[in-house]
Amino acid sequence: PFDEVEAPEERSLWLEADFHFPELLKEDDNATVAPHFAHMRMDSEDGIPRVRYRLEATMGLAGDIEETLLYVLDANEEGVALTTAPVTRHHRNAIQMHYLPARRDPADHITYGANALLGRLLRAVDWELDRGVVQELTDKISESLSSNVSIKAFSEILSTTWKGLHRGTFFSDPKLTFITSEIESLLRHMSVSFTPGHDENLVDFSRLSDGQKSMLYLSLVLSSHAIGRAVLKGESKAFDVKRLKPPSFTLIAIEEPENSLSPHYLGRIVNALDSSIGGADSQALIATHAPSMLRRVEPEHIRYLRLDENRVTKVSTIQLPEKDGDARKFVREAVQAFPEIY
């Protein structure tokens, strides 16, 4: 707090989030209800079932943080949690959040996130029919490289030196190997590359600009979400649903994209999110200081956050006339024409 005189030995924080299940109003089959059914609650007889999550965390003077994720099973009239239950790792993975940071050099975060996404997809692929072909090809590559005169000479000297030091039965003959025949080992070296480049045909993604890396990460997230959605609906048989374990809900959070992207890219991001995200299985949040972003978002979806004199965040919405007409059209066009006012 801004008026704090002495730092306490421990700070505490809690956050709660409600997830509603409007798909229960329909009789269609879905993959989202079953994992959360045991923790669903209703606030009224005709209400929509929901699940409430509560994240509790404490931070010591040294900055070490302890956190706990809980289900809120019962709360009083003021919303204070009375009965809770821990969220298991299996249930935690049912909801995934992908975060695109605001800093201009997001390479570390994006590289880790991209590898995690690709790894999850590749582990869900059935490689059994390809193992024999891959092993045959990798053996040919190793034999071709090993037949080099210089490599042969070095291998002979290495073998002689090693045998003078090691007399055991096992590990008696060292060889230079260049490539593994196991598919899982090969996949660890997989990367995303682009063609064509300015000075070479194949360009690794590490050479992209900060903005391009951000767009690549978003592309991977949206692609992964599309695959998971298709697998859950039974529209795709290319991945093993038990290995892929698609989340029942995906949240994409983008912080101040104007920091690393040119203005003309912002519209493309919003369009990509509009076409891929939505419905009962996904949601996207964009935090921004750029008024131009408001032109690309429906006024009903805009939330304005501001600190009051006590440094408590107040959330405001744009009030639109209830019925469609000239008044509603006027307010909507005013937001898009003069977003800096809002």
Where are these regions (language model features)?
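Glycine-rich phosphate-binding loops of NTPases
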Residues: P1-D139, K152, L202, K323-D324
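Loop/turn-to-beta-strand initiation segments
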Residues: Q96, S248-L251, G279-L285
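Extended helical coiled-coil dimerization/tether regions that scaffold
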Residues: P106-G113, G119-I252
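Walker B catalytic acidic pair
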Residues: E255-P257
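Conserved D-loop-proximal element of ABC-family nucleotide-binding domains
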Residues: S262-P263, G267, R296
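Conserved hydrophobic alpha-helix in the ABC-type ATPase nucleotide-binding domain
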Residues: I269-L273
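RecA-like P-loop NTPase motor core
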Residues: S275-G279, S292-Y342
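H-loop/switch region of ABC-family ATPase nucleotide-binding domains
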Residues: A287-H289
